[in-house]
Amino acid sequence: MQPTRILPDLQCSLMCEEVRQEANANFFLIGVLGLIRVPQLPVIAFKLSVFNRWTAGVGQFIETTRFIAPDQTTVLRKGEVKFSLQEAGQHATNVTVFTQVEFKIAGTYYVEVLVDDVMKLRYPVPVIHTPPPQPPSAPPVPPAPAS
């Protein structure tokens, strides 16, 4: 008997600056983010991409990807996509793009990945405020000799 529905496994989830697809259908990820370092706050990120790959499932599914604020309740961005896997040996790759994300405060933000409302992964994305270095102050100018 052939199973009609098996919830898939999340093979990977990576936040990056951009995802591109080559002519041969392979993906390459640009700027994989482990943290986000910013020189000032608030700041707006033009684009953040979340690359998710699913495998070992059978059926039709809805993936939900959420970007959560440091208070762990405010959903800053949310994306949903439908996908299907015909057999357990297949995989599906989804890319969710979040645009114009405003970081008002430093702290730990979170990416949550769900399939059919079942949480598969939640991982931290620290936003660190690192002000640019200040130029060294010039030494005081000695007074001009009196003539």
Residue ranges and their predicted role:
Residues 2-106, 110-147:
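Contiguous segments within soluble domain cores/interaction surfaces
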